Amino acid sequence: MRVLPATLLVGAASAAVPPLQQVLGRPEEGMSFSKPLHAFQEQLKTLSEDARKLWDEVANYFPDSMDHSPIFSLPKKHTRRPDSHWDHIVRGSDVQKIWVNNADGEKEREIDGKLEAYDLRIKKADPSALGIDPNVKQYTGYLDDNGNDKHLFYWFFESRNDPKNDPVVLWLNGGPGCSSLTGLFMELGPSSIDENIKPVYNDFSWNSNASVIFLDQPVNVGYSYSGSAVSDTVAAGKDVYALLSLFFKQFPEYAEQDFHIAGESYAGHYIPVFASEILAHKNRNINLKSVLIGNGLTDGLTQYGYYRPMGCGEGGYKAVLDEATCESMDNALPRCRSMIESCYNSESAWVCVPASIYCNNALIGPYQRTGQNVYDVRSKCEDESNLCYKGMGYVSEYLNKAEVREAVGAEVGGYDSCNFDINRNFLFHGDWMKPYHRLVPGLLEQIPVLIYAGDADYICNWLGNKAWTEALEWPGQKEYASAELEDLKIEQNEHTGKKIGQVKSHGNFTFMRLYGGGHMVPMDQPEASLEFFNRWLGGEWF
């Protein structure tokens, strides 16, 4: 998860941008929440007096600069490439015209969904041009939503092993508003980027035994662009369904394989929605078999109760916060929970936005002000301008090279790892605190769900992730909640028997704690990451 620079504490992304390391000052006297959000003035007039007082209190968390910040993301500079540049263009309108006879002899669309406004542009990339996995087939391109001027960039890597039989995985980074290409080059892709801004082969890439699609979503993230904005998870889900439907239509050889969705951080919001969107379509060409969420934000009501324990030494690492701060966080938690409960009951932005801002300032803010890395309790924030990691700066510099943008067919003038306008959009639409965990029981009825967590992360810590999985109401809750954590050991290489974490599972639900992993487990523990990933895809726990 990421947060807004120089505006407010929104949560997980806030730790690494310099202005966010400071206590946010009170606005000038008399300022109310309606001042920075002029578009909401009329709506504010309809609120009760108590509600308006709450919003005015929330305004205290905003610096004056918020008054000059746009609420919606600005369009990126871009130059669209001619159709002749692409090897294939799959038009959703053509796919919608394909009808088949069902088992009852009735005509129906081959693929469900409203796809007519979408096109998928595809180019076979030349791996030798960049030196990234040169022996692996790659495709790059854009999903175009022509009706809304949205263009999502993707990069596909075929499996290094047996692409005709290996599964296909969609990888999503979080934010909201952070590029999945950071996951590609910092965590689990075929190459990382070193301090010389050169690609370095990754022996532990997740495409070792699976084909992987990295998607820059929502729009205006990474190489993606738009003249409009997406500001909630549900809207983004429609785009992902269209991308997969058209991609698998063009490449039926991949559609035959098992398909999984994996992601981390704010993908704890995305994935339940995206998977539910896919499963809602009876006639689909997406063979969804499971989902994997790493260090995710999924159930804020439960998870926010574990910031104090994690920061105060109860998560397996020494305390970062002092006793007085821990007590202050304990005192703030009841009000935070009450506000989140109200958000869950109404799912209204008017309730969910104050809950997000109050809780993040009360329970994440104290940790941020220590200067410690919110993504890893063991270390200081080493590079405040790049979300605590120098490597993110290397990735951005690499992806901004003209020759790289040309090689992958990027149409934007520049690349940013995270777009904080998008982050703000999701916040102000109330998306941050909405109860997307309520979709998980429906998923468990149809597919396995893995929740994994590096145990050194603060922002989406393992204590909170374990707790929400045990609190989730579903038919197998009692058996799952009572199951004990068991040792997770390496089985597939020369380090056989090495303990890499703990696991518990019942039915379709599995939780893993990964030792020594921060917010980005594949970066911190690449061997352990590939181990559990391969075994999960192999069906060991389901």
UniProtKB/Swiss-Prot annotation:
Propeptide position ranges: 18-123
Gene that specifies this protein: cpyA
Keywords: Carboxypeptidase, Disulfide bond, Glycoprotein, Hydrolase, Protease, Signal, Vacuole, Zymogen
Protein family: Belongs to the peptidase S10 family.
GO cellular component, one term: fungal-type vacuole lumen
This enzyme's EC code(s): 3.4.16.5
Stated name of the protein: Carboxypeptidase Y homolog A
Signal sequence region: 1-17
Organism from which the protein derives: Aspergillus oryzae (strain ATCC 42149 / RIB 40) (Yellow koji mold)
Subcellular location field: Vacuole
Protein purpose: Vacuolar carboxypeptidase involved in degradation of small peptides. Digests preferentially peptides containing an aliphatic or hydrophobic residue in P1' position, as well as methionine, leucine or phenylalanine in P1 position of ester substrate.
Any one GO MF annotation of this record: serine-type carboxypeptidase activity
Sugar attachment sites: N209, N508
SUPFAM superfamilies assigned to the protein according to its UniProt record, in alphabetical order: alpha/beta-Hydrolases
Top-rank EC class of the record's enzyme: hydrolase
Active site (UniProt): S265, D457, H519
